A protein has these predicted regions:
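Phosphate/pyrophosphate- and phosphate-bearing ligand-binding catalytic cores of soluble enzymes
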Residues: 3-5, 10-17, 56, 151-309, ...
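Short amphipathic alpha-helices in soluble, non-transmembrane regions
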Residues: 36-40, 193-197, 314-318
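His/Asp/Glu-rich mid-to-C-terminal helical/loop segments that flank catalytic regions of hydrolases
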Residues: 307-322
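Anion-binding (especially nucleotide phosphate/pyrophosphate-binding) glycine-rich loop
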Residues: 1-148
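Short glycine-/small-residue-rich flexible loop motifs, especially phosphate/cofactor-binding loops
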Residues: 37, 98, 198, 274, ...
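A common structural junction motif
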Residues: 44-46, 201, 319-326
Length: 337
């Protein structure tokens, strides 16, 4: 195991803060992962598994071992005339994997094009966009169970997928995802009615959309709405859309008729976090070199702050003002370390 000391984490997370890992290593096999974990445990060092770093904010030095997940590869497990089963390494770049599938005309993930991150992070957050959740297309997940200290294969049902959540998020730090099995279709049911996809296809004169044309439309939409983290430091949506009860919704809609919300079931509503933030007076605000991306109140960007704590302070001010005005708790959509 190659062990590095006092490594800057700036190149390894998209917020690009000048935080330090006291110890750092990368792993590209299951055996290397176990070796790194055993070393950390035997030396009483806390450890953190780091993927692409697009969903994390480091706010201080990490006094332990950062293990960079670099297990990659796309393997065909099974194929029929109508579908294909793939196994993909957790360290594989998500956008690269989706592009690979789109080029083969394998359907299912095209609506999830251009989402930053790694394949291993996809089931953890159950990433979703434009009417599609990744959990719909996951057959199983291979992971290391840090409690039982053994490799496990977790089926789709046992992954307990929900809105941007899963068993991996609920039982935090228990499972280390190493590979994901996907089932994709050669005769996919295309989803074109969600978001601006239908509008883009219409503008392009596309009457009979394909996997490729939908992916292209999604890439166009996301490129116009979301900042490229290689150019502007950010981690995408910083907040989740909060859930409230029907009673809370009835109370709020009387006070704020323009409230943006939609029902989840007979008892629950989801509120647009961006609307709450803008209505609390944060649109266009920049403080200490931290602010929002254009008109996206969900996306906090780091213009030039060197410390992650500055970004965290900014987000906490937003949360507090939303709570005071609306009585609604915003939750961070990213990991805070």
């Amino acid at each position: 195991m190659k062990l590095q000391k006092n490594i800057s984490l700036k190149p390894y997370h998209s917020f690009a803060c000048e935080e330090i890992a006291s110890l750092f290593t990368s792993v590209d096999t299951k055996d290397a992962l176990i070796e790194a974990i055993d070393w950390a445990n035997n030396n009483n060092q806390p450890y953190l598994i780091l993927g692409s770093g697009t969903n994390i904010l480091f706010t201080k030095q990490f006094n332990g071992l950062v293990i960079k997940m670099e297990i990659t590869g796309i393997q065909k497990l099974q194929e029929t005339s109508s579908e294909i089963l793939l196994q993909v390494g957790a360290g594989e770049n998500w956008t690269h994997f989706v592009s690979y599938c789109v080029q083969k005309s394998w359907g299912g993930l095209e609506n999830l094009s251009l989402i930053p991150g790694s394949v291993g992070a996809a089931p953890i957050k159950n990433i979703s966009a434009y009417g599609v959740e990744v959990g719909e297309h996951i057959v199983s997940v291979d992971a290391f169970d840090t409690i039982k200290k053994q490799w496990v294969t977790i089926t789709q049902q046992d992954c307990a997928f929900g809105y941007r959540t899963s068993i991996f998020k609920k039982e935090v730090n228990r499972y280390i995802v190493c590979a994901v099995q996907f089932k994709l279709s050669k005769q996919p049911l295309l989803r074109t009615d969600f978001g601006a996809i239908k509008s883009v296809l219409h503008d392009r004169g596309i009457i009979n959309p394909s996997v490729e044309s939908i992916a292209s439309a999604v890439i166009n939409i996301r490129s116009n709405q979301w900042p490229d983290s290689k150019k502007i430091a950010n981690a995408g949506s910083f907040f989740n859309n909060p859930s409230i009860t029907t009673t809370q919704f009835d109370h709020l809609i009387l006070q704020f008729p323009s409230l943006k919300a939609y029902p989840i079931d007979d008892h629950t509503y989801k509120i647009d976090a961006g609307w709450l933030i803008e209505a609390s007076g944060w649109k266009g605000v920049t403080k200490n070199h931290v602010g929002f991306y254009q008109d996206q109140a969900m996306v906090i960007v780091n213009y030039s702050a060197t410390k992650g704590q500055t970004i965290l302070n900014f987000s906490e001010e937003i949360m507090q003002s939303v709570l005071i005005k609306f009585g609604v708790n915003l939750e961070s959509a990213i990991s805070i370390v």
